[in-house]
Amino acid sequence: MANGHSFKHVSYLWDEAKAAALHGDEVGLLVYRSNLLGADLRLTNYGGGNTSCKVKAMDPISANEVEVMWVKGSGGDLGTMKRNGLAALYVDRLRSLVNVYRGKAFEDEMVQLFNHCIYDLDSKAPSIDTPLHAFLPFKHIDHLHPDAAIAIAASKDGEAITKELFKGTIGWVPWQRPGFDLGLQLKKCLDENPGIRGIMLGSHGLFTWGNTAYESYVNTLEVIETCADFVEQMTQANGLVFGGEKLTALPESERRKQALTLAPVLRGLCSSQQSMIGHFSDDPRVLQFVNSQDLQRLAPMGTSCPDHFLRTKISPLVLD
């Protein structure tokens, strides 16, 4: 329990003292919020997701006040990101790119045009997700790939579940390749559903927001917590997971002994072109999947969120 917020499936890490020390520094609070979100891998995988804030700043050429968006730049990790990991861009210039946008076939050229919108010349390179934040009017925005949300977003009835679970307070945008047009689709969803607290992207992830860094942080946690509660309830109601158990797991000591024997062989094979580090996991949830009836059917289907491809590649090797 912290400041009236209690969560079961996510970690509430906000420290009032640390946040107070950053009072008035919206970009500093953005970095702080990003680090907290990235510290919980249930919210987004390493290197995944992006966050932003919009602030007023003085234009160095005209001396006029302008709106600037600070957003996680290309690459990097939310959990360890510093200020130099952000890109700062003129909001009005980003939004005016709609006047030269030629359609989905020309998404790549739009990424190059982001460079003409840069406010801080020391910025990190803008990512392809930049327009997704630019076309939403909110001061603080989080875009994450939480496992619990993706379980809904990637399901056959994802849109209907989202609508029912959140009583219409979370919008829905079907899957499409990230880019400029997806930013326009987010804006359209918001225009058609004023007052929503977030948007679920089919087979992709989640957008949430707030007027302050703290409001955005708590909103994000609350939405993900609701998704996780739903997944847990459905799992318990359905009884069998992944078709039920096919194999019984070995005792822990025996599992570790076999892993110790097998690891050098697998690591050697995986390191044939470059050195690799191996990791062994016998988490109960992992065992539930690898020992299941549906392993052979589900494993080749790959991950449910394209963002995870960066770390796991498309599908795993299954050894009997």
Region roles according to the model:
Residues 1-320:
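Glycine-rich flexible loops
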